[in-house]
Amino acid sequence: MRVVRLAVAIITLLAMPACVPLASMNPLWDDAHMISEPALTGSWVSDSGDAILTVAELSGGRYRLTYVADDSASQYEVHTVRLEDQLYLDVYPDSDWIEKRLNGEAFQSLVLTHFFLRVVLEEDRLELAVMDDEALEKKLEQEGLDVPLLSWKDGLLLAASTDQVQKLVVHFADDPEVWGEPEAFHLCRAR
């Protein structure tokens, strides 16, 4: 039962508006592109009011993101990445949090993957868009781009190196079909 609740919490964040995020074996971030973005820290409430993101900085460019929606929570390690002029989040499940939730049950058999969010951050407003696996696959076919993707029953897995992942993300940086509809949040200020 714990595995089911954990899966529901993770799927809740991954399903942000309605697309399946592209899972990646390798990260988007590297030392050359990871940045600190202090404006991300704090508690963010979705414009719909049904989700809360809490972002706490761990160290230069690394954050802990807690996502709460529908009476379930999930926790992630996040790296902020700037590629050209665009900000992204590389989101990776917090392995300590997962292990605690599962009490060690079947933890070793889980394959944790990265997924990517395109970020628009303006003062007290945050928009996050997920890279959609099916939309990306269609675009790759249309453009004849050779990118290592593995199919599995729940979606696609990007098997590219970090350098290739960065080039792919930059190539589709402004494509709204690949990124899907962003979910908007506003910063919750203490009164």
Q: What feature does the model see in each segment?
A:
Residues 1-7:
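Bacterial N-terminal signal peptides that target proteins for export
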Residues 15-18:
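C-terminal motif of bacterial Sec signal peptides marking the signal peptidase cleavage site
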Residues 20-38, 47-52, 56-191:
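Calycin-type beta-barrel ligand-binding domains and close structural analogs
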